[in-house]
Amino acid sequence: DIKIGVDNAAKELLDLNINVQQIFFDQYNETSFIQSINTILIQSPDGVLLAPVFKEQTIILTKELRIKNIPFVFIDSDISELNALSYFGMHSFKSGYLAAKLLLKDEKNNSDIAIFQAYRTGNSESNQTELRINGFKKYISDYYPDTVIHSVKIYAHDTDKNDKILKDFFNHYPQIKKGVTFNSRAYLIADYLTTNYIDDIKLIGYDLLEKNVIALKKNKICYLLAQR
């Protein structure tokens, strides 16, 4: 968990009179991200450790940080053209490529695949998600070019709406037996599959959230990709 790591580092730095403040935002809400950016700029810290979830807003922030000569480091996903001082996390594009490889392992024919994405408030998709999807689609185009990819939007915090969305989707596309989600919400799909006694869907997700791990142990998720 990133927060635990930052907390531990903050304790170690206390003797050096270094104060670490954590600013949280909703990764599914661009407005929340913008508010956190404004807080950073107002406080004008000596350095910034940032998860650049929304690319365009991150570009705006880093431009201001450079003007103020404030160094910044990225975690979870990278925006290489912004030349952060450092980056800690998995290679998002390569992880998407790997996800496709695992999902289609031993597959001899082209098949329909579902990509489950979370609705986000704002005009931007997650930078990390976009990179993962690009890597995923690259593998598909390289080895299974006739595969049909279906995108399904679900809600991060609304089970009732998700149940209807997923029911309608699987009823309309009964041929789909493989799916992937590029965020930490794979357990939402796994919960639906469990509740509806569906056990023939191969699902891949990201991040070692407890709910994801439980679904993995129950074989409702086949693989979890994580950097920690």
Model-identified regions with their sequence ranges:
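Amphipathic helical "hinge" segments at domain boundaries
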Residues: D1-I34
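Short, surface-exposed alpha-helical segments at coil->helix boundaries
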Residues: K3-D7, I34, F93, Y97, ...
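Short helix-capping segments at alpha-helix termini
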Residues: E12-L16, I67-K68, I140-T147, T194-D200
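Flexible loop/hinge segments that line or gate small-molecule binding clefts
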Residues: Q57-K94, E210-I221
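An alpha-beta-alpha
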Residues: A99-Y143
